[in-house]
């Protein structure tokens, strides 16, 4: 048997097992014996430190290079990004 036939055979066996599996049905009882209790307590402290990151540093470097190469384009981009 070649490898491609093995995967096809396993797929057919899997489908046949699903199709011919016995049907089961869940039975629900009318009395409720479940007890539920929930509580939620939360505290959060947010302290943020601004880190420029690599992307921001690369963008600033690219803008500096662009100012040297094409000053008009750099001015337009600088006005758009603020």
Curated annotation (Swiss-Prot):
Protein name, as recorded: U10-myrmicitoxin-Mri1c
Family according to the record: Belongs to the formicidae venom precursor-01 superfamily.
Tissue-wise expression: Expressed by the venom gland.
Propeptide residues per the UniProt entry: 27-52
Protein source organism: Manica rubida
Alphabetical UniProt keywords: Amidation, Antimicrobial, Secreted, Signal, Toxin
Signal peptide: 1-26
Localization terms from the record: Secreted
Gene Ontology MF term list: toxin activity
Modified residues (Isoleucine amide): 81
Highest taxon of source: Eukaryota
Function statement: Induces paralysis 5 minutes after injection into blowflies (L.caesar). In most cases is not lethal 24 hours after injection, but paralysis is irreversible. May have antimicrobial properties, like most ant linear peptides.
GO biological process, any: venom-mediated paralysis in another organism
A GO cellular component annotation in the UniProt record: extracellular region
UniProt cross-references to InterPro entries, sorted A to Z: Pilosulin
């Amino acid at each position: 048997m070649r490898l491609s036939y093995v995967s096809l055979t396993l797929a057919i066996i899997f489908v046949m097992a699903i199709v011919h599996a016995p049907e089961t049905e869940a039975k629900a009882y009318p009395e409720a014996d479940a007890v539920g209790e929930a509580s939620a307590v939360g505290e959060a402290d947010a302290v943020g430190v601004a880190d420029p990151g690599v992307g921001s540093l690369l963008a600033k470097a690219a803008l500096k290079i662009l100012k040297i190469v094409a000053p008009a384009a750099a001015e337009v981009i600088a006005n758009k990004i603020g």
